Amino acid sequence: MTSPLLRRTTLAALLLALPMTLHGQGRTAPNALPAAERPFGTMRDQAAMQQRWLKQRLDTFLPALMRKHGIDLWVVPMREYNEDPVFSSIVSPETFAARRRTIYVFFDKCAATKAPVTSTCVERLALGGTSQGGVFETKSSTRPVAAQPGGRQAELWGDEQWQLLKAAIEDRKPSVIGIDRSKTFAFTDGLSSGELQGMSEALGATWTAKFRDAEALPLELIASRLPEEEAFFTKMTELVWQMTQTMFSDKVIVAGQTRTSDLVWWWRQRVNDQGLGTWFQPSIEVQRQGVADVGEDPVIMPGDVLHCDVGITVARLNTDTQHMAYVLKAGETDAPAGLKAALANANAMQDIAMEEIKPGRTGNEILKSVLDRMKAKGINGTMYSHPIGMHGHGAGPLIGLWDLQGGVPGRGDAKVIPSMWFSIELQATTPVAEWGGQAVRMAQEEDMIVGADGKTRWSLKRQNSLFLVKSQGK
């Protein structure tokens, strides 16, 4: 057994060996992680970038959306660890949870006079918590407390917060008060029962009569993305492509030895090693000639068709990607023509989807158009695409679900807006002659951008050819 002294000495040595940043100087000690292993910079770099994005979003998107949806004052109360889904879209990257109770208040002071929307139209108040890097005006308690270093004041607490909210509303006299309540969208249903009750009791009938479900306001604020975020998202997508191409290669796969679970954990480990996150457990699927069910965690063999569903999370943004690969048999240099034709059918569906997704259209309208055109081309497939951004399955219209191809009531009725991102997720099933007519499913997913101008483009590109895995391994 190691002695306590030796254990302390060893621990000290390990701590000294850790990467160190010189406090307040932005300089990194020589033994820090190489920049090549930090594809998106340091945490400090990312936080500064996210803070700029936050201010830009609140200065640009929020005033326009409040006016568009007729919300004079939007109130967003929440308690620690029971945050509203809009929380991550309105707070600093240095804030991880609400502080005790936090009430965010947004007031369109230009609405009453119908003045043009500008970045200065919306007042932003934080009744509790911090200014979120200077983007909110904060209010503190007037309760006396024992002297604190630096003259620190008491924090707002209990009924005092509700009364301060009431005073703020009475001063501003809004005609419409938006609250986050919805039976349709989880993203716009963030007002808890307890907070609604407490707020209603404090405000009284005069002001609660002006409550209106904000619904589309938080939904579209969460969904709206800046051009600067688009550029960063493209870099994220580039990295995902690099990783899927490496995973689906003989650098990682040894045909006849590697199991699908090995690839799952290769992905998880590689994501972690680069300081990234993910929002779901990756999956790997195998289709094999003459085999209906390859079983759980099969060994990957020559001739297999491989499919992955993977994603990464960086700076509160998420990707969602599905790629396809073929494991070459001995003597093969390419995939069979039938498999390439099957992938081409999925590509044709992607082309249709990109043409049909336009601002102002609902998810259900887009789904119907895509499926009608797909069937006219003789393609057997399904579409189940979704918004992406601050959440993997993001705010906005669903374009089908895998088991609801006739449309998605409610969630499919939301409309596409400019500056929104989607994951175009779909599959085409095609008989393959080289496999004796066996149907092969080509499931693809690529992230795309609806620009501020309403035009669509891939975040990076889409997969036009199968990744090829050499079967001999390395």
Q: Which ranges hold each PLM region?
A:
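Bacterial N-terminal signal peptides that target proteins for export
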Residues: 1-11
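Bacterial N-terminal signal peptides
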Residues: 10-21
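Active-site neighborhoods and metal-handling regions in enzymes and metal-associated proteins
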Residues: 25-474
